[in-house]
Amino acid sequence: MAMACLCLANISWATVCANSTGVAEDEHYDLSNIFNSTNNQPGQIVVLPEKSGWVGVSAICPPGTLVNYTYRSYVTNFIVQETIDNYKYMQLHDYLLGAMSLVDSVMDIQFPPQNYIRMGTDPNVSQNLPFGVMDSRLIFRLKVIRPFINMVEIPRQVMFTVYVTSTPYDPLVTPVYTISFGGRVEVPQNCELNAGQIVEFDFGDIGASLFSAAGPGNRPAGVMPQTKSIAVKCTNVAAQAYLTMRLEASAVSGQAMVSDNQDLGFIVADQNDTPITPNDLNSVIPFRLDAAAAANVTLRAWPISITGQKPTEGPFSALGYLRVDYQ
């Protein structure tokens, strides 16, 4: 028995458009100088100044595009946490949710993230000529989920990547423009630790073989933890406020800070020897300010082997940062 198969290829008008300059442009929001003692409160929604003008971006679709309309997609890597008044709030940072609206000249107000929004027509689309991506009146809203204390650096990050296509099926592979945010947030609420001095734990000389004998994650025999009392003094923070202290570090292995000798590291812990995991928002030491907005927090620290290997002999050190937050 013979089997016959007739396969028909679809004629596709799908095209992926690009920025007419060949490079995706960026619409950036600087979060510096946005927060103050009034709006730096949990649940507070802060509306950034509206970017009322057109974003000034033009796209171009390749030869072979047979339609004069386009679709626009606003793609994000952040996860929507809640929706308020149609605004889709995503967690952009430990302290902030963020949401946005914008207006298209034809489709009116949009609340990204959203994919394949049918936009208006322009005769240049099918002529391989530049046409305007008519986004304007961008409104960026921030919701404070954890009030800031002191200065917090928010690295520049892309909130939305915007794509233009000629069908709702085209792959989203060529960005036309991006919307980003970042900045240095400084607020009046301030806490000084250890009178501004570095907290140093010095363990002296330790035999290299003691680390390999201890094994990974363990403290060398005969080396005792050291204890420091960290004085905290806050300004523009309410007396008796409940706060937390946590640890930030650039090199981390499990619960340890990794030193400049990759085989060695340090554990920082509370007074009960419970480790504070670096860069973990939930690994904290809770404490309460007194009537003078001050407190003392006990820290303990000890060196450990990271790899279980015998380390290269010589000095080793690690640098971490203590951060105070509201509970």
UniProtKB/Swiss-Prot annotation:
InterPro entries in the record: Adhesion_dom_fimbrial, Adhesion_dom_fimbrial_sf, Adhesion_dom_sf, Bact_Fimbrial_Adh_Pro
GO molecular function: D-mannose binding
Subcellular location(s) of the protein: Fimbrium
Signal peptide boundaries: 1-24
Gene Ontology terms: cellular component: pilus
Phenotype reported upon loss of the gene: Deletion of the operon under classical laboratory conditions does not result in any major effect on E.coli capacity to form biofilms compared with the wild-type strain.
SUPFAM superfamilies, A to Z: Bacterial adhesins (SSF49401)
Domain of life, per lineage: Bacteria
Principal subcellular localization: other
Keyword set includes Signal: yes
Keywords noted in UniProt: Fimbrium, Lectin, Mannose-binding, Signal
Keyword Signal: yes
GO biological process, one term: cell adhesion
Triggers of expression: Expression is negatively regulated by H-NS and subjected to cAMP receptor protein (CRP)-mediated catabolite repression.
Gene3D superfamilies attached to this UniProt entry: Fimbrial-type adhesion domain (2.60.40.1090)
Residue stretches in coiled coil: none
NCBIfam families, A to Z: PRK15199.1
Entry function: Part of the sfmACDHF fimbrial operon. Could contribute to adhesion to various surfaces in specific environmental niches. Increases adhesion to eukaryotic T24 bladder epithelial cells in the absence of fim genes.
Miscellaneous comment in the UniProt entry for this protein: The operon is cryptic under classical laboratory conditions, but is functional when constitutively expressed.
Protein family (similarity comment): Belongs to the fimbrial protein family.
Protein name: Uncharacterized fimbrial-like protein SfmH
Lineage: Bacteria, Pseudomonadati, Pseudomonadota, Gammaproteobacteria, Enterobacterales
